[in-house]
Amino acid sequence: MLLALPACTPYTAALFSLVPDGTVPILLSQMQGIEESNRKRVAELEARKDWEGLTKLAEENLSRDRNSSDWWIVAGYAHSQAGRQQRASECYSEVVRLAPDDMLGWSLLAQSYRDAKQPLRAVQTLNNAHRVRQGTAETWFLLGESYSDLDRDLPAASAYREAVQRNGEFARAWFGLGRAYARLGRRADFEQALKRLEELNSPLAKELAELRPMSR
């Protein structure tokens, strides 16, 4: 991906950083449904952190084509960066409506609810997504994070396990799993998650080790 997200909220940055290249990218610059000239314009506005300009550009294009999921994503991103989380959620809901089989839309919608401090709605959104089609490592990770927001460590651990089963090198999911086990006091399971992080040479291993629970 070409365009970074220096201004994202921590939650949104976390979502986009799930892309395998390990950066904090945005999908805006490579959307096939957006003309090259507009992709460049999007990149320029994002680089300037001109969220009002980006919102206006998205709305102008949506006035011509209300069925463009790409422009709904751009609009949602702009609203999110401007702190308008409810508007962002409304835009991402349109993405889900237009492309229900695309897990990206569901993930963005769930993440927008987390940004708005509504983790229960994020959980409901991701569970609905998993009824539509099989989840990805990323959607299961987000579900684990959403349950963790609610201090529901048992379902969080279950979701994180689904994530690492789909991607055994997903360090942040292993960290979430270990953290859930620590909160549950499950020392043996915690040690397995920690060992895996150490095998991955992840800096998260040190952070997780500090959460080691008492034996149980």
What do these predicted ranges mean?
Residues R64, L98, V132, R166, ...:
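Structural marker of alpha-solenoid helical repeat scaffolds
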Residues A47-K56, Q81-E94, D115-N128, L150-E162, ...:
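Structural signature of tandem alpha-helical TPR/SEL1-like repeats
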Residues E46, I73, S80, R114, ...:
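Position-specific recognition of the canonical hydrophobic site in helix A of tetratricopeptide repeat
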Residues V74, L108, L142, G176, ...:
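Canonical tetratricopeptide repeat
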